[in-house]
From Swiss-Prot:
Reactions it catalyzes: 4 porphobilinogen + H2O = hydroxymethylbilane + 4 NH4(+)
Needed co-factor(s): dipyrromethane
S-(dipyrrolylmethanemethyl)cysteine sites (modified residues): C241
Function field: Tetrapolymerization of the monopyrrole PBG into the hydroxymethylbilane pre-uroporphyrinogen in several discrete steps.
Keywords: Porphyrin biosynthesis, Transferase
UniProt organism field: Nitratidesulfovibrio vulgaris (strain DP4)
Name of the protein in its database record: Porphobilinogen deaminase
Family named by the database record: Belongs to the HMBS family.
Subunit structure: Monomer.
Superkingdom: Bacteria
């Protein structure tokens, strides 16, 4: 029997995702493959007292995991796609992108039923400049406060009354079966998600032809097209996942898609949104073209100001 090791972060959500892929592999190759998990702490797991955008550097949640792939102590890694840098280390690639969970964000609250129901000056917790910008664009009166930690920690702080509401990825909440007394899905086009949000990426070494064949069943072409278009948009902006950039692609046919991209300033006062259509074969290039459009429309100036403010580091 073949044995595979999955490298993963140790958070409850990361473990759920790794266990999910483990189960799919062992079911598909029943009696032929068994899988174990190797838990690895990343820089992003260790530095919890600084907003993510200020920690800086690429691959906050993946670098140490990729080192395990390169040194052979793990065979594959399961990542949240929104954490995966644009450029992978030499010798590694994203072999599979499984079917995507809902990419939206969700507003959670103990007392208030929706974003519109929040009182003037309500304290809203989020670790994301992208969410901050879009929240302030909709509700400039809100007090946005940095919130770090795993899913349980964030929910506990909400329940303890530190915040009137918090915003988290819908996919993580659904995967862990978590919620709050009140919740509202902040769905596109009203509120755009991070590039790759809700999707998983399976990374392994390029020289592992055995894994290419064994794991091919995990790859979901519509999800790959959507994610490649979104990542093309982010690459064209030379941005990371901690910057106020959002991208969301949807399939409009068997091979056709539409992508909407957004860049905003930190206060949500200037928001640039543009849309393009494309096909699977040119997904990444259409994302790059969309980036060129928003840069020409003023996004370059906005991003320069974000970096100059010190709120986020250039990737």
């Amino acid at each position: 029997m073949k044995h595979l090791v999955i490298a993963t972060r140790g958070s409850k959500l990361a473990l759920w995702q790794a266990e999910h892929i483990k189960s799919l592999i062992e079911t598909e190759h029943a009696g032929k493959v068994d899988v174990s998990l190797k838990i690895i702490k990343t820089k992003g797991d260790i530095i919890l007292d600084v907003p993510l955008a200020k920690v800086g550097g690429k691959g906050l949640f993946v670098k140490e995991i990729e080192e395990a792939l390169l040194d052979g102590s793990a065979d594959l890694a399961v990542h949240s796609m929104k954490d995966v840098p644009m450029e992978l280390p030499e010798g590694l690639f994203l072999g599979c992108i499984p079917e995507r969970e809902e990419p939206s964000d969700t507003l959670l609250s103990v007392r208030y039923a929706s974003l519109d129901a929040l009182p003037h000056g309500a304290r809203v917790g989020t670790s994301s400049l992208r969410r901050q910008s879009q929240l302030l664009a909709l509700r400039p009166d809100l007090d946005i406060i940095s919130l770090r930690g795993n899913v349980d920690t964030r929910l506990r702080k909400l329940m303890d009354g530190e915040f009137d509401a918090i915003v988290m990825a819908t996919a993580g909440l659904k995967r862990l079966g978590l919620s709050a007394p009140h919740h509202e899905v902040l769905a596109p086009p009203r509120f755009l998600p991070a590039v790759g949000q809700g999707a998983l990426g399976i990374e392994f070494r390029e020289d592992r032809a055995d894994l290419r064949d064994m794991l091919a069943f995990l790859d979901h072409r519509p999800t790959r097209i959507r994610v490649e278009a979104e990542r093309g948009f982010l690459a064209g902006l030379e941005g990371g996942c901690q910057v106020p950039i959002a991208g969301h692609a949807v399939m409009t046919g068997d091979d056709d898609f539409r992508i909407e991209g957004l860049v905003a300033d930190l206060k949500g006062e200037r928001v640039i949104r543009r849309t393009l259509e494309g096909t699977g074969a040119n997904a990444r290039n259409r994302g790059l073209e969309l980036a060129s459009q928003v840069l020409a429309d003023g996004a370059a100036e906005i991003l320069d100001e974000v970096y100059a403010s010190g709120a986020a580091d250039r990737q």
